[in-house]
Amino acid sequence: MRAAVLGLCTAVVLVSRVADAQMPLPAAKPPDGATLFKQQCAVCHTTNLSEPMRQGPPLVKIVGRTAGKVEGFHYSDGLAKADFAWDETRLDAWLTNPQAVIPGVVMAYRQAKPETRAAIITYLKELN
């Protein structure tokens, strides 16, 4: 009888371990735009006009701003001559491939994932 009880307890423990192993993990929450900006953009760009300029211009209030026109930043010739204002569509194209928007620009960053670009653009809009 003792062996039967011990065997039953062992079986219950093993079955519960198998059930635990088959439980799905909760879905990971994708990073938000602020986190993605810090990870992928903040090396070159600030979000504050009072901070020193970095390799790229500050991006605070970029949505609606005329491209290539932050005072004190030295833009490439192509970007300095740009005649458009930044909007969601233009920012999405820019983050996908800056060279396709304005050939000859210095920015090397490219983001292939639409959801990552959308999160970064949403964050930039919040800075307006």
Each model region followed by its residue ranges:
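C-terminal capping alpha-helices of c-type cytochrome domains
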Residues: D87-N128
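Short Fe-S-cluster ligation motifs
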Residues: K69-T89
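Detector for the c-type heme attachment site
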Residues: H45-E51, G64
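Electrostatic cytochrome c docking/interface patches
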Residues: A19-K38, E51-P52
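Bacterial N-terminal signal peptides that target proteins for export
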Residues: M1-L8
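C-terminal segment of classical bacterial N-terminal signal peptides
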Residues: V12-D20
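The canonical Cys-X-X-Cys-His
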Residues: G33, K38-T47, I120, L124
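Short cysteine/histidine-rich zinc-coordinating motifs and their immediately flanking basic loops
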Residues: M53-P58
